[in-house]
From Swiss-Prot:
E.C. number: 2.1.1.-
A Pfam match: LCM
Species: Mycolicibacterium paratuberculosis (strain ATCC BAA-968 / K-10)
Binding-site residues for S-adenosyl-L-methionine, renumbered to this chain: 131, 160-161
Protein name: Putative S-adenosyl-L-methionine-dependent methyltransferase MAP_2076c
GO MF annotation list: methyltransferase activity
Family to which the UniProt record says this protein belongs: Belongs to the UPF0677 family.
Keyword list, A-Z: Methyltransferase, S-adenosyl-L-methionine, Transferase
Gene3D superfamilies reported for this sequence: Vaccinia Virus protein VP39
Biological function: Exhibits S-adenosyl-L-methionine-dependent methyltransferase activity.
Top-tier EC class: transferase
Any GO BP: methylation
Amino acid sequence: MPRTDNDTWDLSTSVGATATMVAAARAIATNADNPLIEDRFAEPLVRAVGVDFFTRWVTGDLVAADVDDHDSGWKLEHMPVAMAARTRFFDSFFQAATQAGIRQAVILASGLDARAYRLAWPAGTTVFEIDQPQVIEFKTATLAKLGATPQATLRTVAVDLRDDWPKALVEAGFDKGQPTAWIAEGLFGYLPPEAQDRLLDNITALSADGSRLACEAIPDMSEVDTEKAQEMMRRATAKWREHGFDLEFGDLGYQGERNDVAEYLDGLGWRSVGVPMSQLLADAGLEAIPQTNDSVSVADTIYYSSVLAK
């Protein structure tokens, strides 16, 4: 079902299911030989959500190669490698920000992100997690049952990013006078183009000089064969449905021309450095992800780290 302005979801449906998929990929990456990342909470969180498809994938009962359409550029088997590199990027961003003295962090659309629990935060750090109420409630309760303890002062902000989240964030104790480290991981593709701009405007308005932002940009779609891309998504959906999971991936994102993230941020006073996923993979010694013209490959995604100088 296509997205609507006021749609809702949990971690087993719609956009929420993609958070579970990403957590499953992190779990597999964590359990790999010589793992690049360590997210010990990913697997138990995926199991708690209870989507059989992802649970079987994490445990090895479902093999990605059996699910993937081998003629497509988008494959489930690429996910653990890609998410390992992506996770490392955002983990390193927070590490660099705290080493620079920042003690306030915000995770936008936090989903099953467990960084507040698994990273080594300096004393005095406050981490804010923002997501829909039922997502926040589920993750917080599940981690409590696991005996997990936040490694920083954790303040959850149960609000939809389409609502007045800046007000809710400030009411939760956010200090606009202090530099902040923000991350928007895996988020922009699920926002309409104008909502992406509005989010960046709000982040800027809330940020003190010296704040930092890490995000990923939707690649240029101009050279993508749209008809082939749509057919690829239909095939992928059909293959997943055969294995018991029905999610129309083509309905989850928003199309339309977007402002270039780096250029837009530069106009707001940020200075950005971008690195493509292909470079993150190479830097980590991970296998490259093949690129095709039937879709935008995850290898095309650009990851930005920005600093605000008002």
